[in-house]
C-alpha cells in the first residue's frame, strides 16, 4: 500500500476546516489516520498559521485552538528544510512556497483547489490535483 507524500495548499486546509462535507475534510481525517504524508516547510506552516488566525472567526476557532491544530499538523507532517536556491515559476508569488516545497521534497502530489495556478510545476513531475482526485487516489491505495 503506497503512502503518498503531498503538499496541501492552504485553500484545501481552510476548506477542510470550514466544512465537514467534502473531500478536503476527508483528507484531513485520512491524514490523522496515517493514510498519507503531509509535507511541510517553515514557510508553508507560517502561511497556514496566518490564514487560520485571520479566518478564526469564520472557522469558529479560538487562537489557542488554531495553535493546537497547527501543532498537530507539525507532528503529523514530514518537515522539509528548503534551500534558498529557488527561481519563481508561478504567476502568483503567494503560491511559490507550495511549489518550492513540492519540488524540493519530491512530493508525489500538490493538492489544491487552484490547479491552473500550478501549471509550471507539472513540468517537474509533480501531480497537481484537486482534493477529490487525491482523496480517490489515497482511498484506492489503502
Predicted regions and their residues:
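Short, well-structured N-terminal submotif of metal-dependent ribonuclease cores
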Residues: 1-40
